A protein has these predicted regions:
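Short, solvent-exposed loop/turn elements at beta->coil junctions and helix N-caps
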Residues: 18-21, 94-99
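Short, well-ordered alpha-helical segments
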Residues: 33, 38, 46-93
Length: 119
């Protein structure tokens, strides 16, 4: 099994899909944290996306909505980690679900930790 490592820094807050962050030592685990958002596709977007789906190709309205939703879920994840006293998040994952065929739920979750830079 290969472990994929991705690290982003949103406002200098280390976030990784791996269970550790290179260059940092985990000194305390704060626990499970998440960020959630639910977005409506809107009638106009549904109609244009429906028409576009007839001819195939990327549905740009949905791509934009999903990118915005992912960013919002990630920001909420960071806020939750800060609330529990974390300064980084490891083991980050995303999940998405349809709700009633008109809304999209995006969940970002992981483990809040306290890290310090290794010397």
């Amino acid at each position: 099994i290969y472990e994929v490592f991705i690290m982003v820094s949103v406002n200098e807050f280390p976030i990784a899909t791996a269970n550790e962050i290179p260059g940092f030592k985990i000194i305390e685990t704060k626990g499970f944290v998440y960020g959630l958002t639910v977005r409506s596709r809107g009638v106009g977007g549904q109609v244009s996306a429906g028409l576009r789906s007839l001819v195939g190709g990327e549905i740009k309205e949905y791509v934009s909505m999903m990118e915005d939703s992912r960013d919002e879920a990630l920001e909420r994840l960071i806020e939750h980690a800060k609330q529990v006293g974390g300064n980084a998040i490891v083991a980050v994952r995303f999940d998405s679900n349809d709700i009633s065929n008109v809304m999209q739920e995006i969940l970002a979750y992981g483990t809040a930790v306290v890290v310090e830079k290794e010397e």
